[in-house]
Amino acid sequence: MVKIEKVLNGSQLKEFITFPFRLYKDNPYWIPPLISDEKFTLNKKKNPAFDYCEAELWLAYKDGKVAGRIAGIINHSYINKWGNRYARFGWIDFIDDYEVSKALFDTVEAWAKEKGMEGIHGPLGFCDLDKEGMLVEGFEEMGTFITIYNYPYYKEHIEKYGYVKDAEWIEIDISIPEDKDVVSKISALASKAKEKYGLSVVPLKKNKDVIPYIPEVFDMLNKAYEHLYGVVPITDKQVKTYVNQFFSFVNVDYICLIKGQDGKLAGFGIIIPSLSEAAKKSKGRLFPFGFIRFLKAIKKNDTLDLYLVAIKPELKGKGVPYVMLDELTRTALRNGVKRAIASPELETNHAVQSMWRNYNTRIHRRRRCYLKRFD
């Protein structure tokens, strides 16, 4: 028999956060999150997303042991913007037992209906910068620090329970070109764009050089991403939170800011050296030795994770991506980088996918957002 309990205290929250560490203990492809980040994100008093979200967490027990977990989220900003009265589910994990998964979904759906929702979709976080999308292809590919990994049976369970595909993201593995002709072609396209549209690269020597541009970066992010699936604006309070969380993981070599003729930001790329191996070895903890592994990964790495890329909407088609790619490709080659992993891109986002046409690429993972409308 399965028993469901709402998370109401610290010990239950600890069980909620650490359950995947046991579920994926022997899985070489799962990348653990930082436990401290999970505690912050799920804390209603600290995470500024709770200014416009409400959420509940549940644990499933079978034979006296934790067998699954799920979060239910109502994002009021999403409902106001998109007009869909959908709840979200996230932080979904369970053993391969349909009785367990059904109990979890029964619980979150009942909660959503009580709140007046007309459907539920996920896996999604509080906002678009949280992890999202259930893995449906690429189970034998190493995950990244910013994406969800799950077992193949998750897909079978959720589809059996009546959920259908609502959106799909692809992840692209990009080989850094060593062919001089390819590199020269990218540089030529960048030079042409610089000359024609007055574009220039902002010189950055230290992390602190990025700080004056942070408000402009997030303002552009909100505008460039506003039409993407489920996206809601990032608030000023959230900006401060994300900067505090991730700024220490930045290597300024891989931050690219492009200015337009008017001196304002035309586009940006935020790339983070892969933290996957460091996270696995640290088992979700920065201390006592985890931070050393993270620092080493940030300073020297042959793999990059493309975290965020955005272009000013009115400057699309003006060569901004070429300038960005030229700068980042030359830096990557200089630092011995072999490959880059693009963060999830909607399968319908052909504009972003076209950025990689001069590179050798392969789609190595797919992830999906599922939807269930209530009768």
PLM regions: where:
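A structural motif corresponding to the C-terminal lobe/cap of the Radical SAM core domain
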Residues: 358-360, 364-369, 373
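Generic start-of-chain signal for non-secretory N-termini
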Residues: 1-29, 375
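Acyl-donor binding region in acyl/amide transferases
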Residues: 80-162, 167, 282-358
